[in-house]
Amino acid sequence: MCYWIVWPFRQRYDNTTTTDATGSGKTFLACALGHQACRNGMRVLYVRAPRLFEELTLCHADGSFRKRLAAIAKINVLIIDDFAIAPIGPRERNDLLELIDDRVGSRSCIVTSQLPIEDWHDYIGDPTQKRPATAKC
């Protein structure tokens, strides 16, 4: 449960994932949670996973990756929509690990995906990194 929805004064940072088929309301639910977080005075960022990885790739190219990562780390609730909808490479895998690792215990994350959670390990692909990233969501 995301306690910041019910008790915004609690300094607890919960994460949640929602997986189901297209059109089942995952994005609607994630955005509703984000909207409530905004009403409770929290900063929220909604981003589709493919766009996030594209943006971070551009940040690598222009040298602003660390700055962007720091900015995302300050967001109270990060909503990553459509996770695992497109293949990722080693760079995206590392970016995901850094992004999630920066948020553990200090900020909340909501992830939506059509891919069941038990298949995320295969999607992420690198056996040295797949456990920490998915365990923290």
Language model feature labels by segment:
Residues 1-5:
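N-terminal pre-Walker A segment at the start of P-loop NTPase domains
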Residues 6-13:
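Phosphate-binding P-loop
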Residues 7, 36-37, 102-103:
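Hydrophobic helix-cap positions at the C-terminus of alpha-helices
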Residues 16:
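Conserved beta-strand position immediately N-terminal to the Walker
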Residues 19-42:
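Walker A/P-loop
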Residues 77:
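Walker B motif beta-strand of ABC-family P-loop ATPases
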